[in-house]
């Protein structure tokens, strides 16, 4: 078995001896510094690979202070204010933290700002308002009792990630780091030359770990230093008059701040992206990837590898976009908080290797009294392990303060187990693919392939009550035996690919993930009806196909056999009876967890079967539609049992229930992954208790296993 390699450990100046001890104990072959730590000089000659975290946009306050016009900027929108007369004054920085943000008074407000009457949606003419710089207020000529907002540019005078780390770690004497805009001419030339000098001065560094390139995801703090707005996918801080003038020339139309602030929603992933915002993302991808390639080329010219951290200043790189591979990166590394976020990294193409930074991060917010770093490591690994078996990372690692991890009783033992299992997976798979079903599963939403494994997320692996019942679908799929595609509605209009067996639509009504007005396009609904009628499968979760139109809320209510009562059809009686006896629930002994669920779902039609109900309303319904099948879930949070239910639902919807038992384990807390080329089978226990399970291949009992808590057992494929 592999005893060394595939592991990166953090280090710092005060833990040299401990770094070497753990490097040898865990078999690490790479060392890294982190934000707030430094690579010890004593380790520069160690044979391990050395990663250096490199910041293109910060850690040079002297440059930022000397060039205030090229500090990074963000579009902000003021709070809504109601006019009670014909004049209204709005204080722009109300609710924002003035140590992080500063109003841009260098560029013409009448050119780059926008005042909007939010009652009518009309733009207030520029001669009807003015900016009073001494007070920081905008005075507006108003219509009484109309609401108004001001969209404006602000300088980011404290890097958001540095601010987050500063507050999280309670740093006291660390200067606030300004963030400068590498896209602008003076700074771009300076940063390129600075990178060359850095490469020359650091010959012992093997890997330049860009953290990241040029634009931070939107991370805005309020006036009490709390997070005010966080959008891991947000483009609001990727703007400046310089960039926007270039965009106008590229796009052929005038830019508006509303394209970014989006009524105050800031184009979160949940919003159906407008044409203008899609254009902006396309433009930013082209420009960011082109400049990133220039930075990578500099690194390569010094014989070093270039690695990108998928996070922080990653905006514009879009790893699943059509320009990412042109950057020429050697590797991508990202934070792994779940199976979904692991697949977000491991499925990236166009790099030589991928690396996952496992949780917990070695920061005091976890390694403290009342914290449970061992429990977090176990939970994180059980989710990550499922996904690795399907789409493996090449490497794993950790970040933060090593001494916190080293001093926590039992934590290093837990890491030793994780690293050992990770190496076992690679040893047994030997670079081959795991078995998958003979059809593909497609996730349908407005983002499609640009945002693979990113659906229904508010922030990176952060729990939200409003989303966990939908996020569970992707989390389950991340470790399942299916090739998963991500398609958008234009893909449906162009023709559903022949290799897709099941389409899944999951999300809340009118979000980008459900689809909103796309569902009143006859080309979309007729294409999917035809697909299912001819034998395809459709699975809906939450409010799939939802858009009130022509007497229906779910536009494919005929396909799914369900609709949602919106109050309009209460006078129509519904007679729904539950019958839980079905292939989908054959393994299930306990009640199904639908999470927050979706209320007022009723079955309708002639070919449905209700498998679970909440009072008179339905939670799990199957339906026959021509030669095809559909399944509706009111919600589906991640759990081992729900993974089994979804597995069965997909095979049922595809019309191939017998195929599910090609490789099969009986206990719902266990799963099986098969590598046909190496004839090795992994059976994993996803529970914290001992579990017994039977392994079947093509209907034949191969083995009866008793698995320890969280165990992964390897057996030979006897087929």
What role is predicted for each listed range?
Residues 219-222, 403-435, 552-555, 559-570, ...:
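Extracellular ligand-binding/catalytic regions of CAZymes and related secreted enzymes
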Residues 26, 62-64, 195-196, 209-213, ...:
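Hydrophobic targeting/anchoring helices
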């Amino acid at each position: 078995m592999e005893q060394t390699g595939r592991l990166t450990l953090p280090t710092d100046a005060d833990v040299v001896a401990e770094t070497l001890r753990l490097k040898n104990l865990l078999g690490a072959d790479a060392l890294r510094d982190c934000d707030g730590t430094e690579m010890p000089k004593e380790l520069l000659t160690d044979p391990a690979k050395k990663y250096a975290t490199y910041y293109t946009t910060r850690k040079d306050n002297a440059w930022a202070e000397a060039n205030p016009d090229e500090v990074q900027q963000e579009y902000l929108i003021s709070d809504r204010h109601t006019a009670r007369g014909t004049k209204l004054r709005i204080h722009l920085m109300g609710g924002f933290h003035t140590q992080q943000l500063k109003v841009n008074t260098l560029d013409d407000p009448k050119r780059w700002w926008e005042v909007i009457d939010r009652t009518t949606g009309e733009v207030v003419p520029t001669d009807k308002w003015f900016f009073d710089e001494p007070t920081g207020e905008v005075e507006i000529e108003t219509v009484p009792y109309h609401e108004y907002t001001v969209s404006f540019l602000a300088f980011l005078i404290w890097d958001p990630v540095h601010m987050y780390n500063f507050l999280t770690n309670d740093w006291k004497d660390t200067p606030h780091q300004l963030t400068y805009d590498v896209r602008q001419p003076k700074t771009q030339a300076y940063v390129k030359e600075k990178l060359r000098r850095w490469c020359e001065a650091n010959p012992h560094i093997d890997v330049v770990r860009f953290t990241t390139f040029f634009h931070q995801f939107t991370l805005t703090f309020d006036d009490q230093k709390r997070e005010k707005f966080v959008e891991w996918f947000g483009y609001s801080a990727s703007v400046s008059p310089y960039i926007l003038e270039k965009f106008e020339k590229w796009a052929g139309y005038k830019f508006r701040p509303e394209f970014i602030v989006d009524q105050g929603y800031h184009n979160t992933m949940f919003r159906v992206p407008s044409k203008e915002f899609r254009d902006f993302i396309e433009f930013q991808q082209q420009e960011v990837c082109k400049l990133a390639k220039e930075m990578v080329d500099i690194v390569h010219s010094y014989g070093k590898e270039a690695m990108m951290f998928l996070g922080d200043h990653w905006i514009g790189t879009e790893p699943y976009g059509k320009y990412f591979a042109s950057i020429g990166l050697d590797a991508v590394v990202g934070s792994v908080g779940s199976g979904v976020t692991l697949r977000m990294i491991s499925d990236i193409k166009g790099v030589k290797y991928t690396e996952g930074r496992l949780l917990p991060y070695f920061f005091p917010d976890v390694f403290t009294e009342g914290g449970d770093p061992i429990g977090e490591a176990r939970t994180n690994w059980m989710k990550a392990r499922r996904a690795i078996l399907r789409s493996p990372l090449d490497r794993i690692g950790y970040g933060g303060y090593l001494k916190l991890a080293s001093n926590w009783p039992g934590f290093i033992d837990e890491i030793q187990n994780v690293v050992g299992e990770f190496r076992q997976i690679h040893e047994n798979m030997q670079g081959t693919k795991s078995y998958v079903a003979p059809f593909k599963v497609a996730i349908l939403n407005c983002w499609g392939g640009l945002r693979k494994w990113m659906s229904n997320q508010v922030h990176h692996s952060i729990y939200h009550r409003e989303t966990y019942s939908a996020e569970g679908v992707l989390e389950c799929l991340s470790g399942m035996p299916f090739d998963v595609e991500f398609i958008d509605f234009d893909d449906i209009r162009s023709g559903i690919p022949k290799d897709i067996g099941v389409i899944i639509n999951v999300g809340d009504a009118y979000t980008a993930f459900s689809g909103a007005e796309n569902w009143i396009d006859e080309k979309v609904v007729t294409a999917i009806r035809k697909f299912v009628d001819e034998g395809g499968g459709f699975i809906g979760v939450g409010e799939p196909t939802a858009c009130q139109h022509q007497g229906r809320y779910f536009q494919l209510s005929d396909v799914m056999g369900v609709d949602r009562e919106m109050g309009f059809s209460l006078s129509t009686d519904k007679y729904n009876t539950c019958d839980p006896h079905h292939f989908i629930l054959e393994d299930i002994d306990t009640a199904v967890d639908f999470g927050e669920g979706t209320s007022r779902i009723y079955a309708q039609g002639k070919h449905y079967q209700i498998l679970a109900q909440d009072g008179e309303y339905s939670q799990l319904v199957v339906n026959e539609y021509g030669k095809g099948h559909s399944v509706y879930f009111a919600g589906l949070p991640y759990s081992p049992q729900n993974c089994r239910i979804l597995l069965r639902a997909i095979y049922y919807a595809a019309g191939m229930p017998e195929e599910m038992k090609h490789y099969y384990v009986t206990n719902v807390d266990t799963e099986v992954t098969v590598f046909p080329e190496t004839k090795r089978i992994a059976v994993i226990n996803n529970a914290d208790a001992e579990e017994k399970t039977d392994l079947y291949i093509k209907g034949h009992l191969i083995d009866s296993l008793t698995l320890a808590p969280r165990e992964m057992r390897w057996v030979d494929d006897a087929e």
